[in-house]
From Swiss-Prot:
Keywords: Aminoacyl-tRNA synthetase, ATP-binding, Cytoplasm, Ligase, Metal-binding, Nucleotide-binding, Protein biosynthesis, Zinc. It comes from Bdellovibrio bacteriovorus (strain ATCC 15356 / DSM 50701 / NCIMB 9529 / HD100). One of its GO terms (molecular function) is ATP binding. It catalyses: tRNA(Cys) + L-cysteine + ATP = L-cysteinyl-tRNA(Cys) + AMP + diphosphate. Its cofactor is Zn(2+). Binds 1 zinc ion per subunit. Monomer. A motif ('HIGH' region) lies at residues 30-40. ATP binds at residue 268. Zn(2+) binds at residues 28, 208, 233, 237. The keyword Aminoacyl-tRNA synthetase applies. Its EC number is 6.1.1.16. A motif ('KMSKS' region) lies at residues 265-269. This is Cysteine--tRNA ligase.
């Protein structure tokens, strides 16, 4: 049975959805005012995997990820660029979708935008005011945290501690310094919408509560997001939604950890931002997804050259074995080798065990690597094709592609991917493929002429360049050493 770490209880819990066989999942998406950095995409990759696994278990999943398209950052950036907030947000929603598609992730079922849900937001704020959970103050509407006795139950903080340690600006409009805005009165020159309290725009937290209520109703199964959203954003969502409906808002809270860059959290102020667009121009979507999924979603992950090298090495191992397997496959090969099929079946049980324990992707990867090791031990490039070899190749191929369908990995033709991977590395090494081909061909001629001294000299030269050469009955093959 699937167990999920619930951020609210801080424990592993058996997964039982509110409605048998169906899962309602909402994940906080980006505030769209610029190109998004690689840290912003950890959540989309993680929850894409979560959705895939839930569907593998037989659940019908409805998955929404929102766009915050009105916000202080959007307004300020739009003013800097001389654009309207709508023009700016639409531009960067389109750019996000390009990056998302480049990553080979499955589209969400819904991508609600804040500006499309103003009626829902106003309605929810009105409900909270009528229930005396919120109050109007000079055109603002503020949520009274004292009206919600369970405030702090997600983050584990209590209001006394929050007040004691808070650096909260003094605001005479607030009854309690920790009260937060549901609706903000319009400022001169800012975009605004009409409301019973005068023109204004929504506070950040009410947006998700209102969109979820409109899309899913009063309760959802899974609410996801980054750990940095636990407080105050998700804490405030609980207060708003449960204060409004009186029902438990979310059954399972899931939070992915952050990406660090050189031991520091990515931030514009530190100047260590790498956008996803920049990363994909330098590297490859498979590399990014491997970096994210080879670590458990709740662990802090480092992003940098060493992480890229580990991802390249891991992908190369799997894709090299997959390429070899596919070289033995033809449309006529339909029967898996029974002995190797047993190896893959046993490994799949380990994958399921790992994934059902809070989506344990590192252990699932370990099970996959054991299958790669077994395949490489039993099948070598250049072996003559026969039913046994082809049956092993088919069983291996099916296992890796099945694993890939859960992770949205291994989506590319294996041989073509390896060429692309080598070209990427050659570019970083300032080497041309044609130059390596020429050296390998020259070495082949020396071997054919039995000039072994020259052959060995050329091999040493090739190795010094960071290239590995393999000699098989079919000829010599080279790849960048990984």
């Amino acid at each position: 049975m699937l167990k999920i770490h619930n951020s609210q209880s801080k424990q592993l819990e058996d997964f039982t959805p509110l409605t048998p066989g169906q899962v309602k999942m909402y994940v906080c998406g980006p505030t769209v005012y610029n190109f998004l950095h690689v840290g912003n995409f950890r959540g989309p990759v993680v929850f894409n995997m979560v959705r895939n696994w839930l569907e593998h278990l037989g659940y019908k999943v409805t998955y929404a990820l929102n766009f915050t398209d009105v916000d202080d950052k959007i307004i300020n950036r739009a003013n800097e660029l001389g654009m309207s907030p709508t023009e700016l947000s639409e531009k960067y929603i389109a750019e996000y979708k390009k990056d998302f598609a480049s990553l080979g992730l499955r589209p969400h079922d819904m991508n609600p935008k804040v500006t499309e849900h103003m009626d829902d937001i106003r309605s929810m704020v009105e409900s909270l005011v009528s229930q005396k959970k919120a109050y109007e103050a000079q055109g603002d509407v503020l949520y009274s945290i004292e009206s919600f006795k369970d405030y702090g139950k997600l983050s584990g903080r209590n209001t006394d501690d929050l007040l004691a340690g808070a650096r909260v600006e003094v605001d005479e409009k607030k009854r309690n310094p920790m009260d937060f805005a549901l609706w903000k009165a319009a400022k001169p020159g800012e975009v605004s919408w009409p409301s019973p309290w005068g023109p204004g725009r929504p506070g950040w937290h009410i947006e998700c509560s209102a969109m979820i209520k409109n899309l899913f109703g009063d309760q959802i199964d899974i609410h996801g997001g980054g750990m940095d959203l636990i407080f105050p954003h998700h804490e405030n969502e609980i207060a708003q939604s449960e204060g409004c409906t009186g029902k438990a808002f979310v059954k399972y809270w899931m939070h992915n950890n952050m990406l660090n860059f050189g031991g520091q959290k990515m931030s514009k102020s530190l100047g260590n931002i790498v956008t996803m667009r920049e990363f994909l121009e330098m590297y490859n979507a498979e590399i990014y997804k491997w970096m994210i999924l080879s670590a458990h979603y709740r662990t802090l992950s480092d992003f940098g050259d060493e992480a890229v090298e580990r991802a390249v090495g891991g992908l190369s191992r799997v894709y090299s074995a997959l390429s070899m397997a596919e070289s033995y496959l033809t449309p006529e090969v339909t029967q898996e080798d029974a002995a190797f099929a047993k190896i893959t079946q046993d490994a799949w049980k380990k994958v399921e065990e790992a994934m059902n324990h809070d989506f344990g992707t590192p252990d699932a990867f370990a099970a996959m690597f054991e299958v790669v090791r077994q395949f490489n031990a039993q099948v070598r490039r250049g072996m003559k094709a026969n039913p046994a070899i082809q049956g092993k190749a088919l069983a291996f191929h099916n296992f890796v592609r099945k694993m890939g369908s859960m992770m949205s990995l291994f989506q590319e033709p294996a041989h073509a991917f390896l060429i692309k991977l080598d070209d990427m590395l050659l570019k970083k090494m300032n080497l041309e493929r044609s130059a390596v081909d020429a050296l390998v061909a020259e070495r082949g001629e020396a071997r054919a002429a039995k000039d072994f001294a020259k052959s060995d000299e050329l091999r040493a030269k090739i190795t010094a360049l960071g290239i590995s050469v393999s000699d098989t009955p079919e000829g010599s093959f080279w790849e960048v050493t990984k």
